[in-house]
Amino acid sequence: LITDWLNCNEWNMLVCCSDMIGTRTEGMKENALPLRQTDAAASGHDLAAEKLLHPDAMGVLVPGRDKHFYSSGAFNLIQLIFYILRQTGPAHLLLTTYSISMDSIAAIHRKVETGELLSVRFLIDNRVRSISPKPFDYLVTTFPDCYRCLALHAKVALLYNEDWKITVVGSQNATHNPKLERGIIHTGRDIFDFDFKMLNDEFDSGTT
């Protein structure tokens, strides 16, 4: 029965160890870490070989290839978003987070003022209102029509413009994260559309 179950669910595995290729990615930035690359035809995933100390270590984003990484807590979700913006150019942001800091809100606001972020919407957990009242009040004041509250634990960032449709999914919040964190940068339109529909609907039904 176990064998039958494994056979039936084999298609659902994202990456098989036997498919791994130990080649290094060429043409990356000088400060980027080597990536272990799966068979592009099979999966289209780049796996960071080491824990990242800075988003730049991920190298250049390539449409159709996803990046999987662990970070040592040296950067948070907002810093990762800004790294991506340097490659996409001005883009819209839809962000979900379980917690957010005043520094992160201020940094996002600066990007809006400079035009690097074309628009911003936030989905945040209901408990931010009571657990982090100062950041919540700052968010309400700075982005009065751009946030919604709901019961939420997902950490997702959608960045999009005419050329890019990017989904970031991981364990990082929009706060300082001095812990081991896991993340994935999806560059496929299908993943983006899936997340955008879900989160857009949640925004429409959320509260202020």
Feature-to-residue mapping (PLM):
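PLD/PLD-like phosphodiesterase catalytic module centered on the HKD motif
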Residues: 2-208
